[in-house]
């Protein structure tokens, strides 16, 4: 008997798109339901990439009749960041210790239920209660800031003004931090205005912040109200015993539990000078969502010392 060649789920969709389209009225009438079912072929391919490399990945794609759905950059990320897994739950409550600003290979953070390494999580828990009491009944108010060529570093000015407004608490999450001027703004707020600063950084880009800190010859003991944590993104566990942790690709700031500033910017000179970004300022009850996200990231974070 002739063996039937498998056709992958994505491959079938691509081939279907090559067929001449029906009139719009016919398509609207016969519109198929959105298929959100699991694609086992892509899972097998990803697991094979993690455990056996590009060769095994291509082999599974050919066997399953599926298209190559990963970009070259994504493949490199899988190969460089895949790790052996003990199949333990990432949120197992284990003590992960702390990272050092001087260490070259920071440990992989786990995800305890509540972080007891610093007061950042508890501070935000208290702040969340404050915002629930003070602004839950308020309507959300959103203001959008877009990049404009006639206002140099406009988004950076917005961020700096937002930092300056903080009186008691400033919680920050960012994927990339290399801007010395913004670091000075934060340290001045912490040391001179006694604002509690809680900074969470992406674990893979932590070395960028560490290098800046060391280059400036700063000492953590001189800034007791300034805490730094690192955190991973989601963790994918392959059935073949490998795992892959993602990155934090979000940036937002919360000041005094009253306002949140979020957007596509990073804390870097390139972000302000040449990259096109946007930001939006949120007030009212919607700030609660940012506080809850900060608490989730805090519970999975690893403190950085140095």
Question: What do the predicted segments below correspond to?
Answer:
Residues 1-161, 180, 184, 196-259, ...:
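HKD-type phospholipase D/PLD-like phosphodiesterase module
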């Amino acid at each position: 008997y002739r063996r039937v060649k498998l056709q992958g789920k994505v491959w079938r969709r691509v081939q279907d798109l090559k067929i001449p389209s029906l009139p719009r009225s016919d398509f609207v009438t016969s519109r198929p339901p959105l298929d959100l079912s699991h694609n086992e072929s892509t899972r097998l391919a990803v697991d094979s990439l993690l455990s056996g490399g590009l060769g095994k990945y291509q082999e599974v794609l050919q066997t399953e009749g599926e298209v190559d759905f990963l970009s070259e950059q994504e493949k490199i990320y899988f190969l460089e960041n895949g790790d052996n897994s003990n199949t333990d739950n990432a949120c197992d409550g284990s003590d992960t210790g702390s990272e050092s600003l001087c260490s070259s290979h920071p440990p992989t953070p786990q995800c305890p239920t509540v972080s007891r390494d610093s007061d950042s999580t508890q501070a935000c828990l208290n702040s969340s209660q404050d915002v629930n009491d003070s602004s839950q009944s308020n309507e959300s108010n959103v203001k959008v800031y877009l990049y404009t060529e006639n206002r140099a570093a406009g988004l950076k000015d917005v961020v700096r003004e937002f930092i300056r407004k903080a009186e008691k608490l400033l919680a920050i999450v960012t994927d990339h931090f290399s801007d010395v001027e913004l670091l000075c703004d934060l340290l001045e707020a912490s040391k001179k205005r006694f604002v509690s600063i809680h900074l969470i950084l992406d674990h893979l880009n932590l070395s960028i912040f560490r290098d800046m800190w060391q280059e400036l010859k700063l000492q953590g003991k001189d800034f007791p109200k300034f805490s730094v944590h690192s955190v991973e993104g989601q963790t994918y566990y392959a059935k073949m015993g490998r795992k892959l942790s993602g990155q934090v690709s979000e940036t937002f700031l919360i000041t005094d539990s009253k306002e949140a500033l979020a957007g596509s910017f990073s804390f870097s000179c390139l972000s302000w000078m040449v990259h096109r970004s946007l930001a939006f300022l949120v007030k009212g009850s919607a700030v609660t969502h940012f506080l809850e996200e900060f608490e989730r990231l805090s519970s999975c974070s690893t403190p950085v010392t140095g």
